[in-house]
């Protein structure tokens, strides 16, 4: 059994080490054979031989562990000599991209803030006055219906648009006012083009009566849409909103078909992007403003993002499918 340790000392690699282990400790190894011989012995001779086997087995196992450690260190040293690593090589780090909605928000803010518009933030939970009454939305208006608005038991509600921020701003400040507000809004809709939670951006400019005209509104809107969509055509249409008078909606030439007609634009060649108008005097009266004029505009951030990212299903923005989000 002395030869087992002598053989172990001559081992130079992992393969030889494993062969030495199996030869000594395997099921058909030397020590297994020695233990089988015990059944042919009796009495003191059997006990003495068993002690001798255990002694050599423990000595071999101790020598094996020492040799194993030495072999591991030796092979690691040899591998490091062969494998050269160039630490100067640049390892590109995969970076994430902005969510389409965040990108759209930032792009909008980058346009308006240099023009002097102040970003205002409001509460998601509002009362009837700020969300409806102050905006010339009477009690019988369909927007107040339980099927369209999320109500709480204490007569509070989740804001259905960002317009309440305009009301709070006018209550807290005096003209001239030049502000934008953006954030989450809530309505009870869920389909390809509607979700219970969505984002809006609204703007408001108020000054002394006569200082703000529709031409000012038209200039701001046209500059913004050309900044955001590039060289698109614009179409203004008269419309109706309770909180503006006169009111208008603005369309852009279809960014998908270039006005040749497609499913997205319903083969009209035009896409609706925002609503706007001169602030209704009823709104100013609710606030307590006198001798002022102003304009307001609003648009859906998801709507703008869908057009720039060419997304057909609005719900894609709120799902965690990285295959979709990483494509932008």
Curated annotation (Swiss-Prot):
Q: Where in the cell is it found?
A: Cytoplasm
Lineage, top-rank taxon, reads Bacteria
Question: Top enzyme class of this protein?
Answer: ligase
Which cofactor(s) are needed, names only? Mg(2+)
GO BP term, example? phenylalanyl-tRNA aminoacylation
Cofactor comment text: Binds 2 magnesium ions per tetramer.
Name-wise, this protein is Phenylalanine--tRNA ligase alpha subunit
């Amino acid at each position: 059994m002395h030869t087992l340790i002598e053989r172990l000392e001559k081992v130079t690699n992992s393969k030889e080490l494993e062969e030495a282990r199996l030869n000594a400790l395997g099921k058909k190894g030397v020590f297994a054979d020695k233990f089988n011989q015990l059944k042919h012995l009796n009495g003191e001779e059997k006990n003495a031989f068993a002690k001798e086997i255990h002694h050599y087995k423990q000595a071999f196992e101790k020598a094996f562990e020492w040799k194993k450690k030495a072999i591991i260190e030796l092979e690691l040293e040899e591998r490091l000599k062969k494998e050269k690593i160039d630490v100067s090589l640049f390892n590109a780090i995969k970076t994430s991209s902005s969510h389409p909605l965040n990108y759209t928000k930032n792009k909008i803010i980058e346009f308006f803030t240099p023009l002097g518009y102040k970003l205002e933030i409001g509460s998601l939970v509002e009362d009837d006055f700020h969300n409806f009454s102050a905006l010339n939305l009477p009690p019988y208006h369909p927007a107040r219906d339980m099927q369209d608005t999320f109500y709480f038991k204490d007569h509070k509600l989740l804001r259905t648009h960002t317009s309440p921020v305009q009301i709070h701003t006018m209550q807290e400040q005096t003209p001239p006012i030049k502000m934008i507000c953006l954030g989450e809004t809530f309505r009870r809709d869920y389909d390809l083009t509607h979700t219970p939670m969505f984002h809006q951006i609204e703007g408001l400019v108020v000054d002394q009566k006569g200082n703000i005209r529709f031409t000012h509104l038209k200039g701001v809107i046209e500059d913004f849409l050309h900044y955001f969509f590039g060289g698109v055509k614009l179409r203004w249409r008269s419309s109706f909103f309770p909180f503006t008078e006169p009111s208008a909606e603005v369309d852009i030439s279809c960014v998908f078909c270039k006005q040749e007609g497609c499913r997205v634009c319903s083969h009209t060649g035009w896409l609706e992007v925002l609503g706007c108008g001169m602030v209704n005097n009823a709104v100013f009266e609710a606030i307590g403003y006198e001798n002022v004029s102003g304009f307001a505009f609003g648009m859906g951030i998801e709507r703008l993002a869908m057009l720039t990212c060419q997304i057909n299903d609005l719900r894609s923005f709120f799902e965690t499918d990285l295959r979709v989000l990483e494509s932008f």
